[in-house]
Design a protein with these regions (language model features):
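A short acidic, glycine-rich active-site loop
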Residues: 49-63
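Short, well-ordered alpha-helical scaffold segments within catalytic/effector domains
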Residues: 11, 62-66, 150-154
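A conditional alpha-helix N-cap/helix-loop micro-motif detector
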Residues: 7, 58-62, 146
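Class I S-adenosyl-L-methionine
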Residues: 17-27, 31, 35-50, 70-227
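Extreme N-terminal starter segment of soluble prokaryotic enzymes
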Residues: 1-5
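Conserved SAM/SAH-binding loop
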Residues: 8-12, 219-220
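SAM-dependent methyltransferase catalytic region
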Residues: 6, 10, 225-227
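A short glycine-rich, Lys/Arg-flanked "PGG" loop and its adjoining helix->strand segment in the class I
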Residues: 59-75
Length: 227
């Protein structure tokens, strides 16, 4: 089993690949809505870059990105697909992440997130609460303002991947997809252009999957058991 993460532009990487290099790609591209400090429920913490530095969400990817993703992948899941309908074919297999866990919600946050797919299955709903600071995954290490929980990717892999599949995430961000793939035994390739998120996601992966803890003096301590 391999798990590779590259600090590179995903479009350049995909252009270097032959057709259908991956069995399943799961992408979480920028929605083009930006994230302003104090308006997204994510305060500032030592584990994340300041939101003042967030520029990656100012615009959505070009059509070329989606064309390349579909070329190098057999099956594709794209979070925020409702923002890209003018760039993607019509889909009958949407995935819904119910972030309220089926309960009534009056917050400023969206009740759900939608994922477009190129598959022919029926619409499915995944329920896991994550509304700002109210979250069923509050103990998970947070390093990214739009971080999706590892449990979500575990569910996606259980339902849309099969044994032996090769998984790709073109914009790995927090690394949740990589962690889920590793723990479930899938070969994984990811790209992350931002150097800070790239390094933080490696640190998170090493902690959650390899039991490594980076000490203040820069040394690495390895846990004998994981939690």
């Amino acid at each position: 089993m391999t798990s590779d993460l590259f600090n590179t532009d995903c479009l350049d990487y995909m252009k270097s690949l032959p057709d259908k290099s991956f069995d399943l790609s799961i992408a979480d591209p920028p929605f083009g809505v930006s994230y302003a400090r104090g308006k997204n429920g994510w305060g500032v913490c030592d584990n994340r870059p300041s939101l003042d530095d967030v520029k990656w969400d100012s615009k959505i990817p070009d059509k070329e990105f989606f064309d390349e993703l579909l070329r190098v992948s057999e099956s594709v899941i794209i979070w925020g697909g409702n923002y890209y309908t003018h760039l993607l074919p019509v889909s009958k297999c949407w995935i819904v992440w119910d972030k309220c866990d089926g309960t009534t919600n009056k917050s400023v946050f969206a009740d759900a997130e939608l994922a477009w797919t190129n598959m022919t299955k029926v619409v499915r709903i995944f329920r896991l609460r994550q509304m700002g600071f109210i979250s069923d995954t509050k103990d998970e290490m947070r390093i990214h303002p739009t971080q999706k929980p590892t449990e979500l990717y575990v569910w996606l892999l259980k339902n849309y991947a099969k044994e032996g599949d090769r998984i790709f995430d073109p914009m790995t961000g927090s690394g949740s997809s990589r962690i889920a793939a590793y723990k479930m035994g899938f070969d994984f390739v990811g790209c992350e252009l931002d150097k800070t998120y790239y390094e933080k996601s490696i640190e998170r992966f090493n902690l959650e999957c390899l039991g490594e803890i980076k000490l203040k003096d820069g040394l690495i301590a390895k846990q004998l058991t994981l939690f």
